[in-house]
Amino acid sequence: MKKIILFGIAFLVISCNNQNQSKIMEITKNEKLIKQYFEYFNKHDWKKMSEMYTETADFKDPSLGPGIITQTRKQIEDKYAELNNIFPDLHDKVIQVYPSGEKHIIVEFVSTGTAPDNSKFELPICTIFTIENGLITKDFTYFDNFEEGE
């Protein structure tokens, strides 16, 4: 009888561990996806980066205006290509990645670039990505949009 109980407990522990492994694997996939995202960003491969989103994705981004804005892949690609024209050396340095549940990754990073007039910017940013079925469905970005002189 003791062997049966011990076997049952061992089976239960192994079963619970396998469920946790599945969740860990999902988080790892999402972290890899976001790592690839920033690699495409820093290579200025806007097409490949835009293909990491669903056909239309929700954005919350001070540069797009207030509220949630829906963007197509083409709009995403065009937005970053335009930004890259203004700042040819545009670069994001990831500071920290914070997995949050099965569908969210929070990324803290610093965006930098130099304009044609040699003025530089350095902008700390935090983005919450929602990832479903291997694609980004939401990109909620937060940064201080305050400009001097306003």
Which residues does each PLM region occupy?
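Sec-dependent N-terminal signal peptides
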Residues: I4-V13
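Short beta-strand edge/turn micro-motifs at domain boundaries
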Residues: P124-E150
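A solvent-exposed, acidic/Ser-Thr-rich amphipathic alpha-helical stretch
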Residues: S50-S100
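Hydrophobic pocket/interface hotspot
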Residues: I34-Y37, M49-S50, A57, T72, ...
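A short hydrophobic beta-strand element
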Residues: K103-S111
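Short, low-complexity N-terminal intrinsically disordered segments enriched in polar/charged residues
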Residues: C16-E51, E55
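Short, cysteine-centered beta-strand-loop-beta hairpins and adjacent loop/turn segments enriched
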Residues: N85-I86, G113-E122
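Short, surface-exposed coil-to-beta transition loops
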Residues: H91-D92, F121-T127
